[in-house]
Amino acid sequence: MGYIVALTGGIGSGKSTVANAFADLGINVIDADIIARQVVEPGAPALHAIADHFGENMIAADGTLQRRALRERIFANPEEKNWLNDLLHPLIQQETQHQIQQATSPYVLWVVPLLVENSLYKKANRVLVVDVSPETQLKRTMQRDDVTREHVEQILAAQATREARLAVADDVIDNNGAPDAIASDVARLHAHYLQLASQFVSQEKP
């Protein structure tokens, strides 16, 4: 198993911008959200299981998952949410492990929005948190998704607190400023992670 740097941050923090900056440096990026979409693509066994359990109305005419309908169905129903998690989490974990094993860069960047909520930081060698103020999160998300302040506040209330994320962080990128300010932080951390990954590999060798 290679060296894993987990990247997390709340909604609107700029995780994608940071991940893209690492990708530009040749680092393999493994995105938990993308994998979560892949395991329920048309034709996937998990999608058939969801249709069998929740009904065919969960599948759109083009064969894709009706995500909003599914979210509404499980939102106020813990049992149904648990059923869905029990179905999807092992598949997501399996595909994540596969992608980590296939990675060719000195370390991998594992982007996990719910790293703290699901205690997944224990599976990483290093945790990088993209930190912004709650007000910045609100403004960016309202602008990006064209949603109300109240809607974003509900999402923030359901996520781990800023303090909880920072408590598990080994490294922090302050992303309250302009997006182009990230490049120097990423370059500095990249050099550090290359060193850590090299040490990790040498320790792993018998």
Swiss-Prot record:
It is found in: Cytoplasm. One of its GO terms (cellular component) is cytoplasm. Belongs to the CoaE family. InterPro entries: Depp_CoAkinase, P-loop_NTPase. Pathway: Cofactor biosynthesis; coenzyme A biosynthesis; CoA from (R)-pantothenate: step 5/5. Disulfide bonds: none annotated. This is Dephospho-CoA kinase. Residues 4-200 form the DPCK domain. ATP binds at residues 12-17. Keywords: ATP-binding, Coenzyme A biosynthesis, Cytoplasm, Kinase, Nucleotide-binding, Transferase. GO terms for molecular function: ATP binding; dephospho-CoA kinase activity. It catalyses: 3'-dephospho-CoA + ATP = ADP + CoA + H(+). It comes from Shigella flexneri. Catalyzes the phosphorylation of the 3'-hydroxyl group of dephosphocoenzyme A to form coenzyme A. Its main location: cytoplasm.
